[in-house]
C-alpha cells in the first residue's frame, strides 16, 4: 500500500513496466475494489502468510522473505521478475544512528558491521545489491 510503504512505488513501477497504466489500474483500482488486491502495512511479512493460508495467490516480497517463509516450512514458490522489471538497482536502504540512542557505541558497531565485507556478502547472497559508498 503506497500509503504505508515506499516500496509500493517501486512495485507500481514494475507493474507499469510490465503492462502499462492499464495493469496498474486493474490491480490497484479494479481488483482492490473487488477485494482481490489486498493492501498491506508490512508487505514482506503479511504477503507470504496470506499466500500460505490461501488468502492470496501471489504477491511481491523481498528475496529474504522467500528464504524466511521456506525456513518456516511454508509452501511458497519464487518467480523472478526478470532483468527488465527488476527494481533492485532503484531501491535504497537507510541505516543511521539516532542522536539520542541509548547505546551509541552499539549503534556505531552496527554501522561499522553493515559496511563490512561480511555484511555485504550477506546482502549479495540474498540477491540484494551491496552497499555503494
Regions found by a protein language model. Name each.
Residues 1-133:
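Exported/periplasmic ABC-transporter solute-binding proteins
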Amino acid at each position: 500500500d503506497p500509503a504505508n510503504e515506499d516500496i509500493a512505488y517501486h512495485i507500481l513501477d514494475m507493474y507499469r513496466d510490465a503492462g502499462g497504466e492499464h495493469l496498474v489500474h486493474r490491480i490497484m483500482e479494479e481488483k482492490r475494489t473487488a477485494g482481490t488486491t489486498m493492501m498491506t502495512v508490512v508487505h514482506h511479512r503479511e504477503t507470504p502468510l496470506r499466500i500460505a493460508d490461501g488468502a492470496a495467490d501471489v504477491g511481491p516480497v523481498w528475496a529474504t522473505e522467500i528464504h524466511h517463509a521456506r525456513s518456516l516450512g511454508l509452501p511458497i514458490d519464487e518467480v523472478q521478475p526478470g532483468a527488465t522489471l527488476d527494481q533492485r538497482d532503484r531501491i535504497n536502504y537507510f541505516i543511521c544512528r539516532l542522536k539520542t540512542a541509548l547505546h551509541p557505541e552499539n549503534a556505531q558497531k552496527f554501522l561499522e558491521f553493515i559496511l563490512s565485507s561480511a555484511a555485504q556478502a550477506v546482502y549479495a547472497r540474498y540477491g540484494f545489491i551491496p552497499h555503494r559508498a
